[in-house]
Amino acid sequence: MTTQGVRIGIAGINGRVGRLLREEVTTGGGILSGGTARDAAPASDVFATLDALAPRCDVVIDFTHAATVRTHADILARAGVAWVLGTTGLSAADLEAVRTAAGRIPVVHAANYSPGVTLVTRLARQMAAALPSATYDAEILEMHHRQKVDAPSGTALAIGQAVADGRGIDLASHIEDGRTGHTGPRRADAIGFAVLRGGQIVGEHTVSFTSATEQIALTHRSFDRRIYATGAVRAALWLRGQASGLYDMEDVLGLD
C-alpha cells in the first residue's frame, strides 16, 4: 500500500498539537492540504469550518474539542473523508457518532497516538488477564499539565478499559477515583484512578498490579507532544486504502 500523495487536513491547525502536526505531515511524507481555525484568514489554506476544508482532503486529523465531534463526524462521513480522531473527554453520544461515521468512512480513534502508550495499554490488558483481581489490585496514576481540562485523562481511561477487558468486567461499574474521607476497605475488583495536575507535565501514566507479595508496574512518560503528532500522521498515512470501520493504534502498528 502506497502512502504517497495522501492529502491531509488538520482540524485546529493553529492549536498546540495542530502546529506540530503541520510540521509532521510534511516530514512524514504526506501533503498538507490545509486546516481549520477560528481565526482563519480569507484566501488562505486555513478555513473557518471543516465543511470548507473536507473536499481538499483524503484524511483529516482532529485534536480539537469534544463539543465538535458530532458535527465533524457528520461532515466527514458525508464527504467520504477518512478521520484520525485524538479528541478525549467524549460523551456516550459523541462515541456513538464516531461509530456511526465509521460505518461509512475509515476512522482511527485513540486517546493517545504514542506507540509507547499503545504498547503499555496492550500489556496492561494481558497483565490484567493473567493477574486475578482477588489477589492483584489494579491502580492507574496519571499526571498532566495544569491546563488539562478532563480527568482522568483519556489515556488513563483507555488503560483502565484495557484492564477491564483483560478481566472481563465493565469499567464504569468498577472505577474507584476521588477517594477521600472514610472510604472503607478497597473493593477487590476495583480499578483505581489517581490524578495529579501541575506545571507543564506533558503526560505520565503508570498502571500497577499489587498483591501482598509483589508489585508489577508499567510507566510511560511523554517528554514532547511531538510524539502524538508523529503517531497521528502515521495513522493518517496508514488509513489510505483501508475499508470503512473503526480502528485504533494497535491496528496501525500491526499488533492485532
From Swiss-Prot:
Query: Key word Oxidoreductase present in the record?
Result: yes
Q: Where does NAD(+) bind?
A: 12-17, 39, 86-88, 110-113
Identify which top EC class this enzyme belongs to. Answer: oxidoreductase
Listed GO biological process terms: diaminopimelate biosynthetic process; lysine biosynthetic process via diaminopimelate
Q: Name one GO cellular component term.
A: cytoplasm
> At which positions is (S)-2,3,4,5-tetrahydrodipicolinate bound?
145, 154-155
Q: Active site: which residues?
A: 144, 148
Compartment(s) of residence: Cytoplasm
> Could you tell me which InterPro entries the record lists for this protein?
DapB_C, DapB_N, DapB_N_CS, DHDPR_bac, NAD(P)-bd_dom_sf
Entry keywords, A to Z:
Amino-acid biosynthesis, Cytoplasm, Diaminopimelate biosynthesis, Lysine biosynthesis, NAD, NADP, Oxidoreductase
Q: What's one GO MF term for it?
A: 4-hydroxy-tetrahydrodipicolinate reductase
Enumerate the catalysed reactions.
(S)-2,3,4,5-tetrahydrodipicolinate + NAD(+) + H2O = (2S,4S)-4-hydroxy-2,3,4,5-tetrahydrodipicolinate + NADH + H(+); (S)-2,3,4,5-tetrahydrodipicolinate + NADP(+) + H2O = (2S,4S)-4-hydroxy-2,3,4,5-tetrahydrodipicolinate + NADPH + H(+)
User: Signal sequence span per UniProt?
Assistant: none
Per its UniProt record, what HAMAP family does this chain match? DapB
The similarity annotation says: Belongs to the DapB family.
Q: Tell me the protein's name.
A: 4-hydroxy-tetrahydrodipicolinate reductase
In which organism is this protein found? Answer: Gluconacetobacter diazotrophicus (strain ATCC 49037 / DSM 5601 / CCUG 37298 / CIP 103539 / LMG 7603 / PAl5)
What is the organism lineage in this UniProt record?
A: Bacteria, Pseudomonadati, Pseudomonadota, Alphaproteobacteria, Acetobacterales
State the gene name recorded for this protein.
dapB
